[in-house]
């Protein structure tokens, strides 16, 4: 039963610029029953704020899809700021590292599934599903992870434990219920997903909460329910009732599990018979051993590693039927908002086949039952069947969105701040690097930042090396930098730790960098994906948040894509300038707080334990840097600027040797936790060393 709550925007600002007209028109179209609506919103016009005001008008649960974790985190924080009294949740993949199970037949190589789960993100995923099943005023900001299989909402709800003061619940019966839904008893280490018992008091940290729950019994009657701080035990608030949701999304009752095991055994027998008929005895033995082990684990503890591969049987679905996903947790009238739709829509459509090609190999060679193929992302057709009314947000809507809306769109190109689209200057390629260096120095002297986008990784590396030699504080952003490191890198750019960021295809959608006053596009006349009109407009938008923003395109000819991008930018400039003149607006620079956009989403515990490195007295800290520590962070995954904080390659290599010796010594002394910490530091430093080698840095 979902509790009704009203969406309420709390903001010091009122809709301005194009926002009032856009909100009115979006509301009108949705209330008129239009299934697909496109909002063409230029960079910096406040599309996120428009989304929040639209949600307030419509009063409907909303799923906001973003193309990656970084933009999803940015959106979630913006919406949380505007909807502070409502549930704004964050749902992305909870893997920090993920190596999927695979089999390479050509080399007879089996790759076991290996992953590292981010505990905070897993909690946020559970928080999203529990909120969706218990209230209506919910906005979930999600990546494409929301189309992957999840346990069914009915099982998740049915297996939840409802508690209320004065209810008769035997204490031991409650403990058994908690164990059945994968909570573990641990009276020593009190962590998320565990519970502890002290006489007539049971304390639980639910899988979706930061706070603990205390249940006080008087005999078999619940006497009181509290939320408390798990570390200090301080009572935060007392409640009359609450519901404890399972610790995993894959839960089933004893009857359902017994039926699932029976169905798995039946499928196993059929598949073994098929393998034996074909003379594939190795595959048959492989499948028999693995599946029987998993069945035994499910019988004994109700769970096994890789249980998601049996989700079809656990859910009671037929062969080929789609799995339950986050979409199934929403009520029927939910609104879908797809941010950066020109990227997100193709992404949704491409997930199924990539997943399926890997699983077919596992099934064919006896590593998995055929039903494992039904643990998969939705196809585009299945996704389209599950969604209702959709708002597509983009500065450059794609062909699919425009075809769905009949070519019509709602336009939002005027910025309330009065900021004008950047001036686009086309320059010849002859002497382009010298010209670029001159422009960089001019911006650096004015405490402004520069983005440079190239076509190839090699060119980006060479340019970074050259700029370093010229004494410019520069770093290079590439595809191997993981999401959280990328966020830290962008934050350092804003803080002024360096002046120039060189990239390839990473400086586009959604990057919010008000300090950037120049975007340089090298080889702008090379037609292709990275220099299409849509890509150029997105790249130009990175300079649209600065009063003196400019875009320099280095090219010898002006292509059709360049013409289209420049004309569209000029059209938007003219419209904004006319609005500013009519309303007496003097464009003001954006003053956005420089903070890690993931701070509110990832509440990582600060690990300020230090590791002494050799005799140099240098302290290297894992996790976030303590306030008192030097600025240098270990292995940010990019090339460090060659300033005094940077470490030469030879010194870095010596440091790795030093740490390796200390790791071995710690292991010999049976100090395994310390040794593990050394091991992690060494892995980070080796990654940085490889990066330096790739860049040719000494």
Curated annotation (Swiss-Prot):
Which key words are in the record? ATP-binding, Cytoplasm, DNA damage, DNA excision, DNA repair, Excision nuclease, Nucleotide-binding, SOS response
Please indicate if the UniProt record lists Kinase as a keyword: no
Outline the segment boundaries, as ranges, of region: Disordered: 609-629
Under the heading InterPro entries, the entry gives:
Helicase/UvrB_N, Helicase_ATP-bd, Helicase_C-like, P-loop_NTPase, UVR_dom, UVR_dom_sf, UvrB, UvrB_inter
Annotated Helicase C-terminal domain ranges read: 432-598
PANTHER family on file: UVRABC SYSTEM PROTEIN B
| UniProt name for this protein | UvrABC system protein B
Q: What is the lineage of its organism?
A: Bacteria, Bacillati, Actinomycetota, Actinomycetes, Mycobacteriales
Gene, per the UniProt record:
uvrB
